């Protein structure tokens, strides 16, 4: 059959294999867009100044109204990114870049320690105050922009999570499978003050899950679409170098092993979810 997958060209196969992830990504974006469609405004990731000890320890200061641009090389897209990215480096020096009057200002090796808070209390942190009153008015452009940036932020969260798993900063207890996801959705819904807030929070979680699946499916792991695309690339390279494709039996063997390993991993994660639920 001329329409069978095996008879399609390289790029058409790539598009076919990537289509599922693209639709998941698009679904995540559209859900976030729906959630934000009723927003009145969006918090700007701006600073409200620093603790009294900050300038003495770091040699310079952050002024009220400075916009956070990056934290340790990671771009700040949303208001929530500031505290999230800072929390990943607790106890270690941190590099900050802020925008002041449109110009980038770098603050390297910002010290972690005991600082005075806005109410006079002491706390462990970086001595940076984050503004809560800088708001960007919601309109068609800002809703589209924030929805897109939030979707991209979900992709980064997946990348950072994988990074933490590989480096040992996170373990099996931090992973969730289907049981854990259902449990989280239930918690998100019941913790909300109103039905409208519950629906909004569950939709937000659903959007994050959709983007998560999109990214994970594109990883070059056998049995996933990303693995199939990886094999297509290897085949294409083999054809150009040796005028010969990799035998299909080897690809099938690798995919089978990958599928069994993936199912085993999911089983372990599911058991872990159950133990956490009833433990």
Over which residues does each language-model region extend?
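Internal alpha-helical transmembrane segments
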Residues: 1-49, 255-258
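Conserved PDZ fold ligand-binding element
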Residues: 57-79, 151
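Conserved hydrophobic/aromatic pocket- or pore-lining residues that grip, position, or stack substrates
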Residues: 96, 151, 217, 221
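Juxtamembrane non-transmembrane "cap" segments at the membrane-aqueous interface
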Residues: 223-237
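Divalent metal-coordination and catalytic microenvironments
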Residues: 20, 217, 225, 254
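PDZ-domain C-terminal substructure recognizer with occasional recognition of PDZ-binding tails
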Residues: 69, 84-122
